[in-house]
């Protein structure tokens, strides 16, 4: 009897053990299959269909830096999401390559997901679109609605189509900021400002109740110039008369009244768009141009897949190195929103020590940042020149303050016509809260061996020797 029970339990255990192993192996095979399938999808080299339309989607923020589309694995696209950034070089490279590629019959620009783009980036993409149009092929843009910056790109297309319920939102340029000076005074906060340069106006928000004359003058200077550039670019690309864009803005209330409040009709009447179409109507138009059958979808290829499909040759022998400096300049290592002096210095040093690097192009797109970090980077560029290698700075949307400082080490500086550049000084700020504590009946006290030991104590008045 005991032996029988033992045999039963052994049989059950073998069955359970078999099922356990089978389940583990099945899970392993499923995971392995998913991994192999994912790898095959991600690393598969796309093919370029004959007569395809190249789809160029500007998504999120247009930036300078990032991995090349032809080399990166886009997990975001695999998950059917949208990318948060678009690399400027990828867009321009794809458009320029398509201009020389007879397999590409046209371009379709998608701008709905474009959130942020600088003036210089708009200008450079516009120039690339103009070069493509010079081949005699068409660029089509369709959107449910255009913001001002989206439209500044779209205006360079051959055909601009808008959804019948959409709008083209041209507003001009404006800015405003809050001034906390009076509030901080009432709260007993004393803000000590140290600066060099009349136009270094950032600290004004903490010590004044409104902008200074210098601040207004500086803002007017760059805004008026930028707005003139936007208007000229749109008017030239669309074949409009000078002043047409401003005319639409100034007469908008009347135009809206005449059109019964229909913003898309206003855009069409002002020749800002070539027609009002739904997405499917635009697809049918593209299909007709390709000679496709009704009901089919037009042959297209995404610009990232297009770049991945093109064969790249490895660099052999001498080459020109390109290093990108983008974002706020800070001490230490580079991060998501800024560039660190250690990271940049290492990249530049690598170029200097590489015997095959014949020259260095530094692409600058930075509003500035730490003075010390900027000097560290500038010195590394200077060492490249001392090593006998030419250094060229190419300025993007911004190259101000520290961004301009590092550029001074170059043999030559090239800026876009709409680059915001210049050096307007430096500043430092330190708030002290002795009056705030007094209002709250909070006392402070202590000792120090020297007057500098408590120099950073924000609960004490600033020593007059610092003023």
Which residues does each PLM region occupy?
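Small-residue-centered hinge/linker elements
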Residues: 1-256, 261, 283, 287-392, ...
């Amino acid at each position: 009897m005991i032996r029988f029970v033992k045999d039963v339990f052994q049989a059950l255990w073998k069955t359970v053990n078999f099922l356990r192993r089978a389940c583990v192996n099945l899970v392993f095979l499923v995971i392995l299959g998913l991994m192999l399938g994912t790898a095959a999808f991600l690393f598969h080299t796309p093919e370029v269909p004959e007569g395809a339309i190249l789809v160029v989607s500007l998504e999120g923020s247009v930036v300078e830096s990032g991995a090349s589309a032809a080399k990166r694995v886009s997990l975001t696209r695999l998950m059917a999401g949208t990318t948060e950034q678009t690399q400027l070089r990828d867009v321009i490279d794809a458009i320029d390559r398509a201009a020389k590629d007879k397999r590409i019959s046209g371009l379709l620009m998608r701008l709905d997901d474009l959130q942020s783009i600088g003036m210089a980036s708009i200008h450079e993409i516009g120039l690339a679109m103009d070069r493509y149009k010079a081949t005699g092929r068409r660029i089509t843009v369709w959107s449910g609605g255009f913001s001002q910056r989206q439209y500044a790109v779209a205006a360079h297309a051959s055909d601009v189509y808008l959804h019948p319920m959409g709008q083209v939102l041209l507003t001009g340029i404006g800015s405003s900021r809050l001034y906390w000076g009076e509030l901080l005074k009432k709260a007993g906060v004393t803000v000590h400002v140290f600066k060099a340069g009349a136009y270094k106006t950032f600290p004004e928000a903490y010590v004044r109740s409104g902008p200074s004359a210098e601040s207004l003058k500086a803002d007017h200077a760059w805004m008026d110039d930028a707005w003139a550039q936007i208007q000229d670019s749109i008017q030239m690309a669309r074949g409009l008369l000078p002043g047409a864009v401003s005319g639409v803005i100034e007469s908008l209330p009347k135009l809206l009244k005449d059109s019964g409040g229909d913003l898309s009709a206003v855009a069409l009447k002002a020749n800002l768009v070539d027609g009002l179409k739904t997405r499917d109507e635009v697809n049918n138009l593209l299909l007709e141009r390709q000679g496709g059958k009704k009901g089919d979808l037009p042959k297209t290829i995404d610009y990232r897949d297009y770049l991945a499909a093109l064969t790249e040759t490895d660099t052999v022998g001498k080459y020109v190195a390109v290093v990108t400096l983008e974002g706020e300049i800070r001490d230490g290592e580079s991060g998501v929103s800024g560039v660190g002096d250690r990271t940049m210095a290492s990249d530049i040093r690598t170029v200097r020590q590489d015997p095959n690097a014949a020259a260095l192009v530094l692409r600058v797109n930075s509003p500035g940042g730490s003075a010390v970090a900027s000097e560290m980077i500038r010195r590394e560029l200077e060492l490249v020149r001392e090593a006998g290698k030419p250094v060229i700075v190419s300025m993007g949307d911004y190259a101000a303050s520290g961004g301009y400082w590092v550029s001074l080490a170059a043999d030559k500086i090239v800026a876009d016509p709409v680059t915001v550049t210049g050096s307007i000084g430096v500043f430092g700020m330190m708030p002290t809260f002795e009056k705030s504590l007094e209002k709250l009946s909070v006392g402070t006290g202590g000792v120090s061996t020297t007057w500098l030991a408590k120099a950073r104590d924000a609960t004490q008045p600033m020593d007059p020797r610092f003023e």
